[in-house]
């Protein structure tokens, strides 16, 4: 047994050494396109990860989401009140419920700087693990071109960069979202419980992924739904006697969460209030995007749920999240990280985002580019502060439009019984079989 383990370890080291040395040896033939792309993308991907997770984070930013978290867990450790903030200020506030405070409590046992760096490291690792799981979900490996391309693309975005620089928990939320989708796709009873546990843990911290509970409900995966409800209830109930004045969360913090603020808010309501849109127009836009979402979800459920579960789960998750950010009261740009599973569907033959309008929308909410025009502030403010809202809106419209025209084409060809995928796609799939 010992000899076998030693042999295996030696073979792994030998394989890694050979692969590293191979890059420096004279070639005996022309490299493949994939080899060239991997050689170009991996250094950029690795350095982007290091730059975002070390250089930018240690330099810091005026926006610091971790500071109120650290204050809260420090107060929790000392038995002091936590939910006593002044919400009239625009500084980041502590909004986690008592259960979230309990989960974050270990960070209060370290000094501020080590605690913050540990938090950043955990979120960086979570994003990288989520990237790996996404690759495996879509049948790619670490040796494929997709691996460095995905990592580079993720760490070049505003959502990942600001999550790490602002020191937010969204990296862990992304990992739990990917695990939730993977385990629902697995379908086994034990995996359904695990999926519910994963999304339930996110709900202990924030309700960001709450709309995704519709997926196990529609797919009759009641175990995941039960676990997703029970976990946050149990953790919060357990935390109540441990937190000083826990009811202040319900009387002070929760009304603030449910309200609408006109700063750092990319929802239709938030931007509508900021730019002074009439109430009727804000209401009309929210109803319009709810109708678009309903149409997209119905087409996805009717024609993809059983025939193409991967496409259904990932695309439906994107539709639900886009709707919630546009229509509900609060949405911030770095929430867009949760769309990575949806954006990965671009590699699927029947993807709804293989078109330039979809990626124009993605640019809007993923780019680090600033569009403020200091000489024309009226237009610059609109471009800068609305680009995320425009991007979310355009991507949701594109998704529904593609699905709707697929439906019309299939109906005209009298082939709705076989689904609504383009006619050319069915022969291609048959050939792959």
Curated annotation (Swiss-Prot):
Q: Per its record, how is this protein called by name?
A: Alpha-(1->3)-arabinofuranosyltransferase
Domain of life the protein comes from: Bacteria
Please name the GO terms that the record assigns under molecular function. hexosyltransferase activity
Keywords assigned by UniProt, alphabetized: Cell membrane, Cell wall biogenesis/degradation, Glycosyltransferase, Membrane, Transferase, Transmembrane, Transmembrane helix
Which pathway does UniProt place it in? Cell wall biogenesis; cell wall polysaccharide biosynthesis
Keyword Glycosyltransferase belongs to the record: yes
Lineage summary: Bacteria, Bacillati, Actinomycetota, Actinomycetes, Mycobacteriales
- List its EC numbers: 2.4.2.47
């Amino acid at each position: 047994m010992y000899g076998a383990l030693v042999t295996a370890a030696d073979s792994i080291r030998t394989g890694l050494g050979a692969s590293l040395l191979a890059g420096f040896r004279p070639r005996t033939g022309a490299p493949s396109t994939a080899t060239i792309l991997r050689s170009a993308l991996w250094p950029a991907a690795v350095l982007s990860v290091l730059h975002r997770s070390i250089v930018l984070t240690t330099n810091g930013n005026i926006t610091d989401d971790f500071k109120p978290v650290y204050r809260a867990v420090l107060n929790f450790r000392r038995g002091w009140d936590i939910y006593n903030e002044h919400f009239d200020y625009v500084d980041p506030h502590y909004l986690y419920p008592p259960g979230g405070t309990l989960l974050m409590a270990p960070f209060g046992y370290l000094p501020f700087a080590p605690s913050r760096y540990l938090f950043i490291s955990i979120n960086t690792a979570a994003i990288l693990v989520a990237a790996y799981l996404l690759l495996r979900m879509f049948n790619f490996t670490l040796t494929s071109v997709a691996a460095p391309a995905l990592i580079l693309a993720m760490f070049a975005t505003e959502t990942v960069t600001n999550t790490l620089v602002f020191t937010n928990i969204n990296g862990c939320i992304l990992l739990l979202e990917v695990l939730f989708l993977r385990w629902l796709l697995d379908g086994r009873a034990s995996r359904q419980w695990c999926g519910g546990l994963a999304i339930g843990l996110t709900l202990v911290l924030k309700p960001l992924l709450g709309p995704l509970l519709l997926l196990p409900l529609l797919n009759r995966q009641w175990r995941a739904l039960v676990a997703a409800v029970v976990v946050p209830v149990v953790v919060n109930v357990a935390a109540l006697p441990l937190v000083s004045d826990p009811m202040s969360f319900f009387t002070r913090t929760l009304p603030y969460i449910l309200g609408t603020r006109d700063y750092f808010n990319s929802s239709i309501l938030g931007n509508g209030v900021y730019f002074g849109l009439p109430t009727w127009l804000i209401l009309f836009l929210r109803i319009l995007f709810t109708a678009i979402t309903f149409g997209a979800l119905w087409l996805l459920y009717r024609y993809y749920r059983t025939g193409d579960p991967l496409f259904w789960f990932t695309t439906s998750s994107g539709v639900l999240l886009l709707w919630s950010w546009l229509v509900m009261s609060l949405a911030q740009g770095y929430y867009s990280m949760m769309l990575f599973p949806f954006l990965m569907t671009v590699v699927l033959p029947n993807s709804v985002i293989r078109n330039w309008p979809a990626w124009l929308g993605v640019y809007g909410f993923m780019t680090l580019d600033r569009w403020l025009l200091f000489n024309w502030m009226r237009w610059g403010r609109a471009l800068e502060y609305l680009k995320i809202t425009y991007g979310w809106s355009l991507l949701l419209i594109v998704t529904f439009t593609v699905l709707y025209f697929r439906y019309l084409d299939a109906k005209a060809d009298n082939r709705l019984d076989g689904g609504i995928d383009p006619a050319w796609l069915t022969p291609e799939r048959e050939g792959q079989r």
